[in-house]
Structure formats: C-alpha cells, structure tokens
Curated annotation (Swiss-Prot):
Protein name, as recorded: Putative uncharacterized transketolase family protein y4mO
Transmembrane segments: 31-51, 67-87, 115-135
Organism for this UniProt entry: Sinorhizobium fredii (strain NBRC 101917 / NGR234)
Keyword Mitochondrion part of the UniProt annotation: no
Keywords, in A-Z order: Cell membrane, Membrane, Plasmid, Thiamine pyrophosphate, Transmembrane, Transmembrane helix
UniProt keyword Nucleotidyltransferase, yes or no: no
Subcellular location, record wording: Cell membrane
Amino acid sequence: MAQIGHNISLPERARRIRRHALRMGEVQGQGYIAQALGIADVLAVAYFHATTYRPDDPEWEGRDRFLLSIGHYAIALYAALIEAKIIPEDELETYGADDSRLPMSGMAAYTPGMEITGGSLGHGLGIAVGMSLALKRKGSRSFVYNLFSDGELDEGSTWEAAMSAGSYKLDNLIGIVDVNQMQADGPSLGVLNFEPLGPKFEAFGWYVQRIDGNDIDALVDAFDNARQHRHPQPRIIICDTKMAKGVPFLEARERNHFLRVEPQEWAEAIRIIDAGVTA
C-alpha cells in the first residue's frame, strides 16, 4: 500500500473520509451522501491497507487498479482520494462546479486516481475483467479492485462478467459489492431479489466472503484473505453496509438514496463526525 501516515488509524481514516464527503455535500446542498458515509470504512481499508499506489504518480504502471463502477458514488471516491493526497484537499470546495475536477458523477478524464468513468450501471465489472485479463497477459502482479453496488446486480452484464471472470480464473480480480439495500426505486430486494448472493458467485467459480462492511477489523481480514487466497479464481467481498453510517439522523431517513440536507443539518452532521474517532 502507499506509504502515507502509518501513525493514523484506519477508523480515523474512515472518519476523515466521511468528513470530506460531508464538506463536499455541503457545497452543493445535496448528493449521494448516504452512500459515501456507508462505504467510508471500505474505502479506508482499501486505500490505507490493501492497495498499492503512489499518490504523486496516479498513472504509475505498477499500481493496483481501483475501479468505481457506481458513478454516482464519486463523492465517496473523491473523499478517499483527498485523504490519500492524490487530490488536494482544497479542491473539495469546487465539487460539482463548472470546470471542476470533481464533477458530481465521476469522469476519469477529469479526476486523478479515477480509473474509469462509471455511471451506466452494470459495466464496471466487465471493464475490471478486461483489465485483469490484460494485466495477467502482461505478467503484471497488480490487483484490480471493482467496487459495485447491489443495484448493479439487477443488470445482466454484471452476471456475464462474473461468469467470464470465473472462466478465465482471474485471481488478480477482487470484487467488492456494497449491499446497502437501497436503490433509487426503493429497497433493493423489493426491486429485484438477488439473494442468496454468495452462492451465486460461488457457482461462477469465485472465492466468496460476506462481512459487515462497516467493521474495520472484518474488512482488514477480508482484504488480506482475498489478496492471499492461493486458488486460481476471482475473489469477491460482499459488504453489508448501512446507508449514512455515522450520522444517526441521516441513517433514520427512510428514503436516503439521494439526500437534500438543510444548511444547519450539514453543520450538525459534521459535528457528529468530528466527535468520533480522532486517533
């Protein structure tokens, strides 16, 4: 992993990622902030424990590739890239503005450290399969991570990619599914029931782990297991997360896929996060 501030704990990294995301949300007064709060622990472990990269050289050939399939989660990835010092912190004030490198839906052409342009849901895993196959053929030892959502499990292209990854035995591919149980149209299982999820990926030849995606210790173990797994097969970490994790009054909102938050509520949310882990 990158050599960045090893004296800072992973829970503190997650707290900072949440804070960066809230500050960006405050700039626009709205956004996919619940997803960012929910996935912050995953991103903290990914960027400060698991992946290899150089903050001052985002295009370094030897890096692990971290793909964000879910384009509307861009605010979460920006927060992690800011914490990783790939993007300067002062840029968060430009979030969503004209000519910003931080558009509301991620654009790889604009943003350092963003490997792909996501957004048309269901395509990220297929891109990850192609990258993984190409890296293997080049003899690279880099891993490809693909973060995708439970909503993307509604897309047939996701399952075509899952089958292909198993067929090609892509042991350099690590999928991460954010199962937060909410989509734009309502609760995920009410839109299309994808359970039982683990056995489906196992049937396609994947090594499967399912964990609490807001448990730092469980995430560390899962990422370590995925990287160290010796069988020639792709790996997937199914992360059950809580939307708006860490800010109780936002967690309690029934429909929090896209949040519009009053000015005083942003301040309260940041105050709650600042009262959390500090070391």
